[in-house]
């Protein structure tokens, strides 16, 4: 597996202390970790879990804006934007990094996302992806997909910045649809990675 020290994990937090207490220990130690907080400063017990940079926004400007701030602060070549209620399985970051290096034509990658009951999560609230079709035919191998959910996006920082990141006029919901369309149209395919 590849060394993950060239990956920044960007997390947007809004009243997410409980979720962060599960996520933070699952992130590989060599990854830079950035939490953009749209609420109040995180408590000491969260800060004791691992090293991370916290950026405290003076106001909640939404998910996309906070992601853009986190990616701008990232010092690594790759960023992995994840929701705070995520927990990484072993080698998730390394597998995504390895696949991204094997598929330089792709614009971004998304892992298989499981709910707490281990059923596969579905990207909600998108007119770009039919839920019934996805659940019946979702790929069991690395495949191109029409849209990614904002819950987990692995992308080169350079690509994200080149595209201007998330549209900050979209406060919450559908900012991932917009980014997906721009990535597909201007950079390259979106790739689903079911073994991560």
Please report, for each region that a protein language model flagged, where it lies by residue.
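Glycine-rich, basic loop-to-helix element that forms the pyrophosphate-binding segment
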Residues: 57-74
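Catalytic beta-strand/loop signature of glycosyltransferases that borders the donor
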Residues: 187-196
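Acidic metal-phosphate-binding loop of nucleotide-sugar-dependent transferases
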Residues: 40, 61, 85-87, 170
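Acidic donor-binding segment of Leloir-type glycosyltransferases
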Residues: 24-59
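Cell-envelope/extracellular polymer assembly enzymes that use nucleotide-activated donors
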Residues: 6-8, 32, 178
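Acidic/His-rich active-site region of diverse nucleotide-sugar glycosyltransferases
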Residues: 56, 68-69, 87-164, 169, ...
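Short, well-formed alpha-helical segments that are part of the catalytic scaffolds
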Residues: 11-29
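Short aromatic/hydrophobic "clamp" motif used to bind/position activated sugar donors
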Residues: 79
């Amino acid at each position: 597996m590849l060394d993950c020290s060239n990956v920044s994990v960007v997390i947007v937090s809004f009243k997410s202390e409980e979720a962060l207490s599960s996520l933070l220990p699952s992130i590989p130690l060599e990854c830079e970790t950035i939490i953009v907080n749209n609420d109040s400063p995180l408590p000491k017990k969260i800060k004791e879990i691992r090293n991370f940079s916290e950026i405290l926004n003076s106001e909640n400007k939404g998910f996309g804006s906070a992601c853009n701030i986190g990616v701008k602060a990232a010092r690594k070549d790759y960023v992995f934007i994840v929701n705070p209620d995520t927990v990484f399985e072993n080698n998730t970051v390394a597998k995504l990094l390895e696949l991204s290096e094997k598929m330089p034509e792709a614009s971004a990658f998304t892992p298989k996302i499981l709910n707490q009951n281990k059923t596969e999560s579905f990207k909600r609230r998108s007119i770009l992806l039919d839920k019934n079709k996805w659940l019946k035919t979702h790929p069991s191998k690395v495949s191109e997909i029409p849209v990614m959910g904002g819950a987990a996006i692995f992308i080169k920082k350079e690509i994200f910045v080149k595209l201007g990141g998330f549209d900050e006029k979209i406060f919450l919901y559908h900012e991932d649809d917009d980014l997906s369309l721009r990535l597909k149209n201007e950079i390259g395919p979106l790739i689903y990675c079911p073994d991560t």
